[in-house]
A protein has these predicted regions:
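Short amphipathic alpha-helices in soluble, non-transmembrane regions
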Residues: 101-106, 142-148
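Short, amphipathic alpha-helical "lid/cap" segments that border enzyme active or binding sites
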Residues: 47, 137-144
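Conserved PLP-binding catalytic core of the aspartate aminotransferase-like
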Residues: 61-68, 75-109, 119-124, 131-133
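Glycine-rich beta-alpha junction loops
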Residues: 4-8, 42, 94, 119, ...
């Protein structure tokens, strides 16, 4: 079972199973029976993305490396950074401090928005960095330098 959501920028899901399970699901899953099939353009897009995924290994490796580098730097600086993905939160704490830090990063050219209550619990305001494979090592180094300021 898997989905085609965020990971490949599409919609829908799939299941790989034996024929007997397929028949069972078709005949017993009312929610499945009464759903609408995906439009052909969605299926074509998903196929197009899936065909290209193997060639993107280098980009995935780079994204993992810069994500780990940023997480390590934030942790070393004393920030709580609970993340296992390329979305890296820098938990600052107080809303006011988070806003000031975000504004400082923005003035230096980084797209950094504060995330505050009620989106997150009181006292856990943060800046959430959504990294992409297009971000360079140099840019991450600049960000870390600013954070370490």
């Amino acid at each position: 079972v898997g989905t085609f959501g965020k990971a490949i920028a599409s919609a829908g899901a799939y299941i790989v199973c034996r024929q007997v399970i397929r028949e069972y699901l078709i005949n017993k899953m009312r929610t499945f029976i009464f759903t609408t099939a995906l439009p052909p353009i969605n299926i074509q897009w998903t196929s197009w993305v899936l065909e290209r995924l193997p060639a993107l290994q280098q980009k995935r490796t780079h994204l993992l490396q810069i994500s780990e580098k940023l997480k390590e730097a934030l942790t070393t600086k004393g920030y709580n950074c609970p993340s296992v993905s390329h979305i890296v939160p820098m938990i600052v704490g107080a809303s006011e401090d988070t806003i000031l830090k975000a504004e400082e990063l923005q003035r230096k050219g980084f797209y950094a928005l504060p995330v505050r209550p009620p989106t997150v619990p009181e006292g856990t305001s943060r800046i959430r960095f959504s990294l992409t494979a297009d971000i360079t090592e140099h840019e991450i180094d600049q960000l870390i330098k600013l954070i370490n300021g």
